[in-house]
Amino acid sequence: MKRYLFIFVAAVSLSCARNTIDYSEVISEMHSCHDTLQWTAPDLFNALEGTYDWRYVQAWGWGGSYESESDYTGWTLILNPDSTYSVNGADTVWYEGNWSLENSWYSFSLNLDTSVSTLWGQIVYCPPYLMFYNSPVDGPDHLYEKR
């Protein structure tokens, strides 16, 4: 009986194991992957359509670095092909409106009706990950994962 109890406890413990993905490593590899894909505006617009789950934030400042996998847990970003979007948290719509892809000479960003802090910065897309790269202007970088 003790043996079965031990096996049961071990199985439950393993099923509750913490996420083993190192999101800081994912972010560090995003730029080279994004650059390799050489997105055009129409291709990127079509590729971005879908539902994304927020995964990670990292930022740097005078006080050191900050990173979290829990600040926006449960937040989802939905980018629809009809150029509408919504950001939901805990099954509640926090933001919604229209989106478009803004293209500068070397990068892309989302142009939104409403300002959403987790969507600021350059878009760096390497499926299934979508990063909003805001650290060049001392903001946080947010990472989403496509479902």
Feature annotation, model-predicted:
Residues F6-A10:
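Hydrophobic alpha-helical targeting segments used for export or membrane insertion
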Residues V12-S15:
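C-terminal motif of bacterial Sec signal peptides marking the signal peptidase cleavage site
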Residues A17-W94, S107-R147:
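Lipid interaction determinants
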Residues M1-Y4:
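Positively charged n-region of N-terminal signal peptides that target proteins for export
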